[in-house]
Regions:
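Single conserved hydrophobic/aromatic residue that forms the stacking wall/gate
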Residues: 1-17
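Basic polycationic patches enriched in arginine
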Residues: 16-20, 24-28
Length: 303
């Protein structure tokens, strides 16, 4: 890791993942490297061997490196397709392994977006322009009709749209906002006419006009004897610790969107724990110790 970090200190590849609306950085130092210099200093295959856990992840990470190099070599903005939370975690691990800390951003159309693109910035661009790569479509229908996330996703898939071209799907009463790759928006505007048996009226809107549903969470205050995954999962999903251990060992539990088979995996404030069929929750706050030596927790379980 030290060798890779040393070879990338002078490159123009950077990462920026700050909230939208935050102040721009006043200064960036980026020194471009020739392609031959890049190849001589970093072994791409070695980096992928280190970061990828399986063949599918290797393909994903190789694609991300391609986009990164495209931006650097041609000095232009570049972006991946939409990435799931798990894929974003893999991308972050790759960037960390390559010591890339500035010059790119995860963007999904709004602050709490789950599915996001990874945008790489050239040295002349201070801030990511997500609207260059994605747009929003608003589908309206009668309020008396009931449609779900699955209805809209199924309708889009029926049109031959792949999941990586789709961002978040925001369903409200009588309308649904779709965040999509800009290159497929014209096709969807012409071809998406219904979801299920319900007729839709579809129009393009600005990302700033998205109707984002209010986040609904259930607050859980509890204490645990240890900040192990099994203990915290048992608290968040209201089950015994033994049952939580069974879920973990069967591969049904993810810690920060990564499958985790170790019941004793450490959990920290800000971590997200999910289980297939049970939903997910965030460790919103880790408090102090009680008189009995138990750790206080505030959990936000998503509804």
């Amino acid at each position: 890791a030290y060798e890779i970090a040393q070879c990338l200190v002078g490159s123009e590849m950077c990462i920026r993942d700050r909230p939208r609306g935050a102040a721009r950085a006043k200064r960036r130092v980026c020194v471009p490297l020739a392609h031959a210099e890049w190849e001589s200093m970093m072994d791409r295959r070695q980096l992928l061997d280190r970061a990828a856990r399986n063949g599918d992840e290797r393909v994903l990470l190789a694609h991300i490196l391609d986009k990164c190099e495209q931006s650097r070599n041609r000095n232009i903005p570049s972006a991946t397709d939409f990435l799931s939370p798990a894929e974003q975690r893999s991308a972050q691990d790759l960037l960390h392994a390559a010591a890339i800390h500035d010059g790119c951003a995860f963007c999904g159309g709004f602050e709490r977006a789950e599915r996001r693109m990874l945008l790489f910035l050239p040295d002349w661009q201070e801030e990511a322009d997500e609207s260059e790569y994605m747009t929003a479509l608003r589908c309206t229908y009668r309020k008396e009709d009931t449609l779900t996330h699955r209805d809209f996703l199924g309708s889009l898939m029926a049109q031959g749209v792949t999941r990586e071209k789709l961002g978040d799907i925001l369903v409200s009463e009588g309308s649904c906002d779709l965040i999509v790759s800009r290159d497929i928006a014209p096709y969807l505007l012409q071809n998406v006419t219904s979801a299920g048996r319900v007729k839709l009226s579809v129009s393009e809107i600005e990302l700033s006009d998205l109707s984002v549903p209010k986040l609904k969470v259930k607050e859980i205050r509890d204490t645990v004897s240890t900040l192990r995954l099994d203990a915290v999962a048992a608290s968040g999903f209201s089950m015994s610790r033994g049952k939580a251990q069974e879920l973990i060992s069967s591969g049904r539990v993810q810690l920060n969107y990564r499958e985790t088979l170790k019941s004793d995996a450490p959990v920290a404030q800000g971590d997200v724990i999910s289980a297939r069929g049970l939903g997910k929750f965030e460790v919103a706050e880790v408090g102090g110790l009680s008189k009995k030596g138990r750790t206080a927790l505030l959990l936000h379980r998503y509804l």
